[in-house]
Amino acid sequence: MIGESCKDIYHTGIVDRISSEAPVPIFKSEECFEKFGMAKNVHLNVLELNQECDIITNSDTHIRKERFIDKRFDSQVFRLDINDNCSPLDIDVLAYSNLSSYDAIIVSDYNKGFITAEVAEFISRSNDCIFVDSKKKDLSCYEGCFLKINEKEKSELTKPVDPKKLIVTSGKKGALYLENMYPAIQSEVFDVCGAGDVFIACLTTFYLHTNDIVKSIKLSNAFSSVSVRFSGNYIVNMNEVLNALQN
């Protein structure tokens, strides 16, 4: 697992009036809790699937995302991002990590500066089984890797990618692969935060066990469909998915 991590901080409370200083809401914070986000959220989801997983990441205290939630409506009032970028990963760290010895590599590239194009190219040459979730607009640095992006990210690509390696998630519709749409489980969407992390974690883990990308996509859809039922980053377990499939 390689990628940027952050600390997700959730403030829950209420908005009960508009400020007299400016036309903005006044938020009264009542509770605050933290979760790991981005690459560390992917990492935790892989571990939940009983798959061993090492991680190379930045300090999770550097990038922070603070969300302010009105508990009466379970709705986000606003989000505060602090330190929205980080220093590049040193290629020497990767060289010492013996990436070729791993069964697979997941790259969670939020395009915050940790994974430069040079670093991405190094990773791509280091293993034959690599799954990438990237917000870069030029994905040519990930040649030969499986790429998982969403519809918006696909529309912003500046260069074509190999369709045999491209999976496009489409929210409640499911995931598109080789012009086939694999549907998601119908589910009440409460919060999409972290759903992409769940998908890439499951996609990689199930592919290791099945060597079947289509079957892995279908299973990943199921897990992601469960994750959106909960607020914030959520670690999905197998029992929850089985219950969702039965219902």
Task: Locate predicted features.
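Conserved beta-alpha-beta core of the PfkB/ribokinase-like small-molecule kinase fold
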Residues: 18, 22, 68-83, 104-160, ...
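Conserved N-terminal subdomain of the carbohydrate kinase-like
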Residues: 7-104, 234-247
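Conserved phosphate-binding/catalytic region of the ribokinase-like
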Residues: 101, 118-129, 134-141, 156-247
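Short beta-strand/turn micro-motifs composed of small residues
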Residues: 3, 47, 57, 134, ...
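Active-site metal-binding loops of divalent metal-dependent hydrolases
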Residues: 4-5, 110, 198
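Catalytic cores of large soluble enzymes that bind and process phosphate-bearing ligands
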Residues: 31-34, 38, 111-115, 146, ...
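A secondary-structure boundary/capping signal
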Residues: 2-3, 150
